[in-house]
Amino acid sequence: MVFSSAKREKNNMLAVNNLCIERNGRAIIQDLSFTLEGQKRLFVQGEIGSGKTTLLLALLGFVPVTKGEIKLFGKVCRKEKDFAPFRGTIGICFQNADDQLFGPTVLDDIAFGPLNQNVPREQAYHIAEQQLERLGITRLKDRMVHTLSGGEKNFTALAGVLAMQPKILLLDEPTNGLDRKNTEKLTALLRELSLPILISSHHHGFINELATEIISL
């Protein structure tokens, strides 16, 4: 079946057109264009300092855009206030999981998101239990967040994001702190998700296993 360009654009949850971002007069990102929809797993690869994290923050309205266009669910977003209504539908895991862990326990942390979405307490904790099981980290549920290893924090942060049922998932260097076994576990999990994912990474094996599309910065 062939869709018109208008139909394809409507199906894009995220569309970036000719995006340019500068800092202190230096170009960080130049003329970048891509779309995200369906179950696409789009990888952004590049060396440290190439702008991968900057791009993810720009997609949430946290970094100003010099030129170009960001569309979320068909709406052009230019100012910070334009992005605000969509942040509840976009899940992000930061490179440093400590930036988004609120604790005190792992179970409490994962339930925090649904509670913040006004989900009743009993249901929020049930959702948290489901995500613990889904990610295979039920054994951690009563652990204090600050006692976790780097890899355990990564999976806890991801469980917390998935508990809020995002429509788009953004992951910034998600294999940082993971050994080979847990990288394989993460790969299998992401492959099963039925939502579009944008992933920044310089882990070539991880990229090769998962990517449906790759862009380089």
Swiss-Prot record:
SUPFAM superfamilies: P-loop containing nucleoside triphosphate hydrolases. PROSITE patterns: ABC_TRANSPORTER_2. The keyword Amino-acid biosynthesis does not apply. Gene3D superfamilies: P-loop containing nucleotide triphosphate hydrolases. Signal peptide: none annotated. One of its GO terms (molecular function) is ATP hydrolysis activity. Residues 14-217 form the ABC transporter domain. Keywords: ATP-binding, Nucleotide-binding, Transport. SMART domains: AAA. ATP binds at G46, E47, I48, G49, S50, G51, K52, T53. CDD domains: ABC_cobalt_CbiO_domain1 (cd03225). GO terms for cellular component: ATP-binding cassette (ABC) transporter complex. InterPro entries: AAA+_ATPase (IPR003593), ABC_transporter-like_ATP-bd (IPR003439), ABC_transpr_CbiO/EcfA_su (IPR015856), ECF_ABC_transporter_ATP-bd (IPR050095), P-loop_NTPase (IPR027417). It holds the Pfam family ABC_tran. PANTHER family: ENERGY-COUPLING FACTOR TRANSPORTER ATP-BINDING PROTEIN ECFA1, HEAVY METAL TRANSPORTER. Belongs to the ABC transporter superfamily. This is Uncharacterized ABC transporter ATP-binding protein HI_1618. It comes from Haemophilus influenzae (strain ATCC 51907 / DSM 11121 / KW20 / Rd).
